[in-house]
């Protein structure tokens, strides 16, 4: 069931899941034990300014955005069910998809013209083509623009809430009935120890996320709530810096199977 959830998301990971560079395979291997957890099973992470235990995992959770939903790779529910941690997993995307321009549908244009988002993008030399009908993001230097747009879409989804869908009824219940705090973070596999030539791209996206989403997250949320015309009454917290799988393993040394640790050099 966990495999099905991962491979049927909008990212079409079924075509890549058997690859070592699948960004969906690693979180599946790391968090699948919490999909149908045994009593007492939990994983510990430092998020939201404190150390928290998470006891349940959902994969490829779908939240409302515009047209198509956003699919967040993993949603972890805390032991007291009051917090949901949304994780967007990144493996090699920041090496493969750096561009100076990305184009998206016109439905996003009004949101991205809001001052908080404009300031966030401008902080890293990203601008919007104000004359174009569609949303066009431009950068002075090649950057992983899709990662930033994806994070903003995920934040829209956190504000708007889950897409009504029978196959994610347990996640919908956790979001609607119990959760008081929603935390958004991205989690990286730090590959700089093995992909030395890509170390600059890794560091660039690490700082890009921190500078745009981390530093301006609250202002971005204000813009989203104003644009969407709603606030879900929940506290939304944005991690300022990316998490890493390496740190997760350090904090939970007995969690992963030894074969997975060896496979990924964790």
PLM-predicted stretches and their roles:
Residues 58-66, 90-94, 189-193:
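Short, solvent-exposed loop/turn segments at secondary-structure junctions
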Residues 74, 90-101:
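A short, conserved, highly charged catalytic patch centered on acidic carboxylates
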Residues 96-184:
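Acidic, metal/cofactor-coordinating or nucleic-acid-engaging core segments within structured domains
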Residues 76-86:
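Active-site beta-strand-loop-beta-strand hairpin of nuclease catalytic cores
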Residues 1-38:
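Interdomain/boundary linker segments immediately adjacent to catalytic/signaling cores
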Residues 38-67:
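A short acidic/basic microdomain associated with nuclease active sites
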Residues 69-77:
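Short acidic loop-to-beta-strand element that houses the catalytic metal-binding Asp/Glu
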Residues 156-266:
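Non-catalytic C-terminal interaction segments of nucleic acid-processing enzymes
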